[in-house]
């Protein structure tokens, strides 16, 4: 850039900062906050890896949708539990008026610290959300669900009245306000959504989500969660086999997917994921039905191996660290120590 352009740019930047305040405009490289995105784990190791950044991004809009009883609320409650473990403050906007505090506690949520609102209508729910976001004190807000955000006019009207596009307009207006505020306060806003069928679709999927198109555009991450099978103990069904597909991702490559088990009353079977992904990267050995870690056999069959890891959490954490290092490029301290030691040995050897 020549001197005249540089002077003109400097004058323009000074004028902008004078009029709108400091840090209104800056070089992208100067803003470390723009480069480092804080994440909250989903509670599923496979899904954290599929998201490409190790979890759900803070300061962004996130949407999770799927059919009934597919695990949408379970996944969001697990994310709340993980956020609370990091010392975060969370809020749950229960528009469906269906949150079970006993189940939330089973999934690890500290219900004493969880803020809960059960609003009367959609406008109230989204206004409460915006006020919480602007407070700067909340790390994560879950709205359950978009379909239940009923506009005030619809609630006050008669049962057969037509209210075409009211909810879509409400969502569009609210998201215009919430998106910028969420980024400034580093608060994640997670919307749970339901599926509806479009009439008369001949080609392609007839499925669509409720609340219009605004959420599809404003969301940085969109996840499609489906039940693909049952988890059985003998003849008794004890959980769901679940698949989550990352449909949209502004933080990493999209269209990755994760499969895991959700056990009724317990949530994601995290240790089973650790074993499966450990085998995949070679950290856990598998010979026939036996699993091993290093020179030690940890169990015959996955169920026994899960019990071993439950009794030995240090080994489970070690395997998980190796999986994250391999799949996400997260620094593995044990590997770094070995590399440093090897480099020292090579440096001490005489050059031939």
UniProtKB/Swiss-Prot annotation:
Its main location: cytoplasm. It is found in: Cytoplasm. Keywords: ATP-binding, Cytoplasm, DNA damage, DNA recombination, DNA repair, DNA-binding, Nucleotide-binding, SOS response. InterPro entries: AAA+_ATPase (IPR003593), DNA_recomb/repair_RecA (IPR013765), DNA_recomb/repair_RecA_CS (IPR020584), P-loop_NTPase (IPR027417), RecA-like_C (IPR049261), RecA-like_N (IPR049428), RecA_ATP-bd (IPR020588), RecA_C_sf (IPR023400). CDD domains: RecA. GO terms for cellular component: cytosol. GO terms for biological process: DNA recombination; DNA repair; SOS response. ATP binds at residues 66-73. SUPFAM superfamilies: P-loop containing nucleoside triphosphate hydrolases, RecA protein, C-terminal domain. Belongs to the RecA family. This is Protein RecA. It comes from Psychrobacter arcticus (strain DSM 17307 / VKM B-2377 / 273-4). The lineage of its organism: Bacteria, Pseudomonadati, Pseudomonadota, Gammaproteobacteria, Moraxellales.
């Amino acid at each position: 850039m020549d001197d005249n352009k540089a002077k003109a740019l400097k004058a323009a930047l000074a004028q902008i900062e004078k009029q709108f305040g400091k840090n209104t405009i800056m070089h992208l490289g100067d803003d470390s906050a723009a480069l480092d995105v804080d994440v909250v784990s989903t509670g599923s190791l496979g899904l954290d890896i599929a998201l490409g950044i190790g979890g759900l991004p803070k300061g962004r809009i996130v949407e999770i949708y799927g059919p009934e009883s597919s695990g949408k609320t379970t996944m969001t409650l697990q994310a709340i539990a993980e956020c609370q473990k990091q010392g975060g403050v969370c809020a749950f906007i229960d528009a469906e008026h269906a949150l079970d505090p006993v189940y939330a506690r089973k999934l690890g949520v500290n219900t004493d610290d969880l803020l809960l609102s059960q609003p009367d209508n959609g406008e109230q729910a989204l206004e409460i959300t915006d006020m919480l976001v602007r407070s700067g004190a909340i790390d994560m807000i879950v709205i359950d669900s978009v379909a239940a955000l009923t506009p005030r006019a619809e609630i006050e009207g008669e049962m057969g009245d037509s209210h075409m596009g009211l909810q879509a307009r409400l969502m569009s207006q609210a998201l215009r306000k919430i998106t910028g505020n969420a980024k400034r306060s580093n608060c994640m806003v997670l919307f749970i959504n339901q599926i509806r069928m479009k009439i008369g679709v001949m080609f392609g999927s007839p499925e669509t989500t409720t609340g219009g198109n605004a959420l599809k555009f404003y969301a940085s991450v969109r996840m499609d969660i489906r039940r693909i099978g049952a988890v059985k103990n003998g003849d008794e069904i004890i959980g769901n086999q679940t698949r989550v597909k990352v449909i949209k991702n502004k933080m990493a490559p999209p269209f990755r997917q994760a499969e895991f088990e959700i056990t009724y009353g317990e949530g994601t079977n995290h240790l089973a994921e650790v074993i499966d992904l450990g085998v995949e990267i070679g950290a856990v050995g598998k010979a026939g039905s036996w699993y091993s870690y290093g020179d030690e056999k940890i169990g015959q069959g996955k169920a026994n191996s899960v019990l071993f890891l439950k009794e030995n959490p240090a080994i489970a954490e070690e395997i998980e660290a190796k999986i994250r290092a391999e799949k996400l490029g997260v620094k593995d301290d044990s590997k770094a120590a070995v590399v440093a030691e090897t480099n020292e040995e090579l440096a001490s050897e005489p050059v031939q």
